[in-house]
């Protein structure tokens, strides 16, 4: 198998997870294994953990399941996220589609380093981190509600809140 990815490692775009799920999907098709999309995503998590990349927790769902979605899962070792599809009009309607920008800074960091810091804080029962993670869970639901309602103003406000939460969770969100 030969792969070419023109996206640099550590870009934050989930490339390793998406590539791993693509390879597993190709093996599934070639061998007639009859895996569904959830199986491929679960096997991607296992593969990424075996390779010690630290990724594979959610990125592959973005690539394997099309469209705008909210992923929800319960606490515990075995993750079986529920995929809830959302309308895409805030991203495709002519009044809104030009209001979105994905900007790549060229600064790279690997998921392994980022997740090590976050998981360490969870295992140490860091009150501020656990509280922030709970807030982020509620925030994701608020964001999906804004998208469902087509409320662009609320959506934009929540994007700002997402940025603030990411900065609080990960000290490297704004590297020097």
Language model region names:
Residues 42-52, 60-176:
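C-terminal nucleotide
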């Amino acid at each position: 198998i030969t792969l070419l990815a023109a996206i640099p490692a550590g870009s934050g775009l989930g490339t390793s997870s998406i590539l791993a799920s693509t390879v597993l999907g190709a093996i599934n098709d070639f061998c007639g294994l009859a895996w569904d999309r959830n199986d491929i995503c679960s096997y991607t998590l296992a593969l990424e953990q075996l390779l010690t990349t630290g990724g594979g927790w959610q990125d592959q769902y973005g690539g394997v399941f099309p469209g705008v979605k909210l992923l929800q899962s319960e606490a515990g070792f075995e993750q079986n996220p529920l995929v809830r599809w959302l309308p895409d009009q805030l991203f495709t309607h002519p009044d809104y589609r030009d209001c979105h920008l994905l900007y790549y800074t060229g600064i790279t960091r690997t998921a392994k380093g980022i997740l090590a810091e976050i998981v360490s804080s969870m295992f140490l029962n860091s009150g501020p981190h656990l509280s922030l993670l709970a807030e982020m869970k509620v925030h994701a639901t608020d964001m999906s509600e804004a998208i469902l309602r087509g409320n662009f103003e609320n959506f934009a406000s929540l994007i700002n809140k997402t940025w603030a939460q990411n900065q609080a969770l990960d000290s490297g969100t704004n590297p020097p």
